[in-house]
Amino acid sequence: QLVRRLAEALSGEPFDLVLGVARGGLIPTALLAQALGARNILTAAVMFYEGEEALPEPVFLQFPPDVLLFGKRVLVVEGVWDSRRTAFAVKARVRRAGGVPVVATLPFKPGRNRVPDRPDFYAEETAAWVVYPWALEAWPKGSYPSGCLRPTGPGKLPRALLPGPPCWRSQHGVV
């Protein structure tokens, strides 16, 4: 429902490309791109911590070359607008590349916002902790529903598929 709501709000907006922010924004990016009929999809990955230590500046692990962003209207998709640090860093980098960033997120958490700014588009406001069905590391150990991918060890990618029904069903099918 949140993706549908956000897609409806964005449907009249012209975008040249969609930039999904890893990790939490990648699945919403794919769903929004599908809903909007967008084909030019890029990704960005930003790191603010090394281990437990906060870094003084964000480190971009992945970002599109400036030439792909220059003169483009870029829909930046974040999974959650929480402290705003990630969105701020990505937005600034798109601007430095000569692009026009427009930030969209499913939930906006105004109470956690560290600066007086808001996403350009969002589906809903919330104060709640947001846990998406695809964020398996947020689930208590051993509580993965059957049918879900589960991590096979610390720091390892989900590989084992358990038998059973899918993790999460919506009225429109499996998500």
Question: Model-found features: residue ranges?
Answer:
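PRPP-associated nucleotide enzymes
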Residues: 1-175
